[in-house]
Amino acid sequence: MGRKFFVGGNWKCNGTVSQVETIVNTLNAGQIASPDVVEVVVSPPYVFLPTVKDKLRPEIQVAAQNCWVKKGGAFTGEVSAEMLVNLGIPWVILGHSERRSLLAESSEFVGEKVAYALAQGLKVIACVGETLEQREAGSTMEVVAEQTKAIADKIKDWTNVVVAYEPVWAIGTGKVASPAQAQEVHANLRDWLKTNVSPEVAESTRIIYGGSVTGASCKELAAQPDVDGFLVGGASLKPEFIDIINAATVKSA
């Protein structure tokens, strides 16, 4: 069976009660491809998770944007994987480049978080990606492989993992990796999984692209053989997110 297209919407630290209501209403009213064709997950800030989960159409799932690396306790400001499970939140985004850079989360720490979240029953969108300096130095694959290895070292079962390749230089900048650039990294990542994890994991694991994906760029990116979907930032707050979801039909055509 082929890899089902996956579209995640990362709302980041955005939204008010009324804005969230507008986004949810837009998604509920939108004509989107069937769940047989595309899996859709949106990730609002923690405070809006229960509201969005309750009001959003059932075929769109909800993700947290982060969770703590171990069981809850004296960790002020953190949210544990167990809390998310208790709320019925099925997904979590881990290792986003903004947390790696702004909060100094190391690859090893991200690997530990992924392993713990999976062990509690969450599904994980695990993010990897290089900076502009790293790309210009020709070390893209070295960086992405190191980040992926830190996850592979901690987990054995990849069933509930989606890998998101996010070139950091393309996040929020309006710059998009060309379809060829995205395909090259995705194919190399899949080869890395084949060699270092297993051919089965390489074949079944979805590798999605994140980095200024828009309604204008999504179809050409979706047509690439190793691009299995998107992790969308700013555009996931806008009506064009519907168009990005529907880029999944390029794969099923």
From Swiss-Prot:
GO terms for molecular function: triose-phosphate isomerase activity. Keywords: Cytoplasm, Gluconeogenesis, Glycolysis, Isomerase. Substrate binds at residues 10, 12. GO terms for cellular component: cytosol. SUPFAM superfamilies: Triosephosphate isomerase (TIM). Its EC number is 5.3.1.1. GO terms for biological process: gluconeogenesis; glyceraldehyde-3-phosphate biosynthetic process; glycerol catabolic process; glycolytic process. Pathway: Carbohydrate biosynthesis; gluconeogenesis; Carbohydrate degradation; glycolysis; D-glyceraldehyde 3-phosphate from glycerone phosphate: step 1/1. It catalyses: D-glyceraldehyde 3-phosphate = dihydroxyacetone phosphate. The keyword Lipid biosynthesis does not apply. The active site is at 96 (electrophile), 166 (proton acceptor). It is found in: Cytoplasm. Homodimer. HAMAP family: TIM_B (MF_00147_B). In plants, there are two types of TPIS, cytosolic and plastid. Belongs to the triosephosphate isomerase family. This is Triosephosphate isomerase, cytosolic. It comes from Secale cereale (Rye). The lineage of its organism: Eukaryota, Viridiplantae, Streptophyta, Embryophyta, Tracheophyta.
